[in-house]
């Protein structure tokens, strides 16, 4: 069993992509994407604004048939930039028209909850952990955060792995290259 902890939580409301070209998202819910983002920032509490300042992400819904979307229902990608001239955002993946997209923030508490929740279903005696070099002490207040949780999940059995700048693992039944994740086999 492979688990992928993306460690992000959705903020604001989900939007349907109404205008896009490859990874340039111009319209969300029939309005300019940057306008939607500006509203999100304006309405956010101070803690969420601080998390946004450290790095805002988008989640692309992997199963459009769900009645509501929660953490884990998204393929999380980074926001690469903005085109203020057309009110668009550029993201780290394609977002075809009709795709549901929601903004996300990453924080240590969510990342811990996400990893621990995913590891609860693991029944293994050993594990391989591939964790982003942007996690660890950059995200958590302790060293070896992910390795400790995985070790606990396998009952103290052997754990090996490495830091990565791009981890591979499944989300929505398909393998993807990720950033800022802990992918565990």
Feature roles, as predicted:
Residues 1-127, 132-157, 162-185:
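Small-residue-enriched flexible segments
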